[in-house]
């Protein structure tokens, strides 16, 4: 694995690799070999990743076969920057009690100029091998996530909770209220009467600019109008529900017709009225006023009686008058015969119906008498 510079290195408190190394012991020597060498089970490895891979293989075999065991990894390398990493970054729980203030200030000033982006920080296998067996790490570094000029590049340090509790000369971070109610975190310490941290002004300025840009991009209508789901919108009048309906006055049917059609309609109406009001209307096949069967029989009987009276009156008259009136009587008889033809037919039908009614009445009377 390629060795990256120690200025971009960071350690996590819980690491799977450090947990794996908890069962082994590491020992280092201060040799001046720049290439470095790693000894594991009487074998020499040029990189720490190779030695660690061999150790992992033996560890897996030990899980399968109880007879297999892991050995020790001996580190024979020392870098100048690595010593700074071990002396300043990794500290026990009492790190700030035995702190060399000059080295600590030099380390922080060095880190201010070198660290640019927190995403670029990583640990190599060599750094992982130098960590303690329990994987503890009490110092965490937080750097700015943006780039500015060299004068504005600043480093922020944040201490663990355990170190704050044990160090009586340490003042924890406090927040100061700036303009626009922005919280400005500040880290201060009384080491040699100097401040170790300062305000994060650049981050606040960047946040302000982002907020201003977001508010400027919002449309004006969204600023003026409320949300459509608010109570005001729900309780307001809904124009789309109150659709105005126009009622037209009734128009007569014949208003748009031509004068010829109106005249025809009037003439037809007059004909119908005349036909209904005409009492002397002759009987036709399509009808007229039809009476009931009893009324028809009555009219037929009255007609027969009138004919008989006329016939009797004609017999009682004098013979002279009869001779004189022969021509007139013949003519009247002919007219009577012609007028009696439909009457006789209707009388025959009426007599037939009467006979049937009489039979029905007799039958019903005959059925009732035995029951009595």
UniProtKB/Swiss-Prot annotation:
Q: Where in the cell is it found?
A: Secreted
Single GO cellular component term = extracellular region
Among the Pfam families in the record, one is: LAS2
Q: Which UniProt keywords apply?
A: Phosphoprotein, Secreted, Signal
What residue spans carry the Polar residues bias annotation? 255-265
Residue ranges, annotated region (Disordered) = 248-268
Q: Which residues carry this modification: Phosphoserine?
A: 161
Annotated signal sequence range? 1-31
Q: Which GO terms describe its biological process?
A: negative regulation of cell population proliferation
Q: What does this protein do, in the record's words?
A: Might play a role in cell proliferation.
Protein name, entry field? Lung adenoma susceptibility protein 2
Q: Which organism is it from?
A: Homo sapiens
Query: Corresponding gene?
Result: LAS2
